[in-house]
Amino acid sequence: GCSCICIFIFHHIINYNHLYEYLIINILKHILFIKKMTIKHFITEIEKIIPLAQAEDFDNVGLLCGNPEREITNVLICHDALESVVEEAVQKNANVILTFHPIIFSGLKSITGKNYVEKAVLKAIENKIAIIALHTALDNHYFGVNHRICRELGLDQLKILIPKKENLLQLITYVPVDYAEQVKKALFEAGAGNIGFYDECSFSISGEGTFRPIDGSNPFLGKKGTTEKVNEIQISVIFEKFKKNQIISAMKFAHPYEEVAYQIYAIENENQYSGLGMFGELPEEMEEKEFLNFVKEKFDLKIIRHSGFTGKKIKKVAVLGGSGASGIKNALQNQCDAYLTADMKYHDFFTAENRILLCDIGHFESEQFVVQQLYEILSEKFTTFAVSKSSINTNPVNYFL
């Protein structure tokens, strides 16, 4: 009797363990299935933070090579997606490289490995590794490259150095009173009404709208052939140009009318929260040589090319990571005492004219915080795959001192 009971209990313990194991395995499979992310989905999520559409027109950002439907294993972040970095991705089992600079900048007529660009792209394709570039999409972001430089320098009262022009649109639409909040909510969720550090910004006016449905219509209100008068709300919102299509779609989806009346206007206002470069003020003013030593220390520089000393103390500082000679004029207009950038030519230094201290700190050096910056963003947002930083210094410029 006892042996039969023991066998019965033992049998059920074994079955219970098998059942427990079965359940755990299937729960894990379910979790893993839910959390898998494709490259296309990854880019969509990245764009919620750093919209690729805010990149400069000349730039080449987004997915440069790779299958957007492939599932992500791991992500490697780098400054330049060179062949050596692609090999590093292979070793780290990363099938996505998120790079700052686009390895493909202009069109490729062939991919045979005859130069450094083709070698990197060919190796990525052969190993099924996708390359995604951000470049000026991150440059133009308020909290992008230049904001990080300002943070490292301890600047405050930050403003965009070269605000984007012809970047803002205004939408005006007319909605029955009872549906105004519904339409506004849809517009806000699509990205309209964001102005600096405020969102859901709009302006509304009450009025009377008229219309007469004719043959072929399917009116939400009224009858065919009869003129209708409706109490309506005029809603006005501002948005960035690259959001236009998504905002119009959201408005039409939420609006009750078959034919939605709306106008879109280009406005002359500069976008004060998107653009290249940034400027702000140091906590305390510095002598020029003291400032240069301060910059050398913060950026771990061996050398700084600079214009002649002005004899003025440094308080207001402008920065533009990468090639930034085009920002000298803006730095002067904003009465900056110093301007940090890179790739300035011989004649660019003449434009200082004893009014500003121009500092060329090197292209790579000026953008050196980008990899860490992206690592912090991705590590916080994505938890279903490993994110790592490239250990390879891709700076092509060397100094003999």
Q: What do the predicted segments below correspond to?
A:
Residues 2-6:
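Cysteine-centered motifs
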Residues 8-10, 16, 20-22, 33:
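Aromatic (phenylalanine/tyrosine) cluster motif
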Residues 10-11, 371:
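N-terminal low-complexity, intrinsically disordered patches enriched in charged
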Residues 18, 27-401:
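Hydrophobic structural segments
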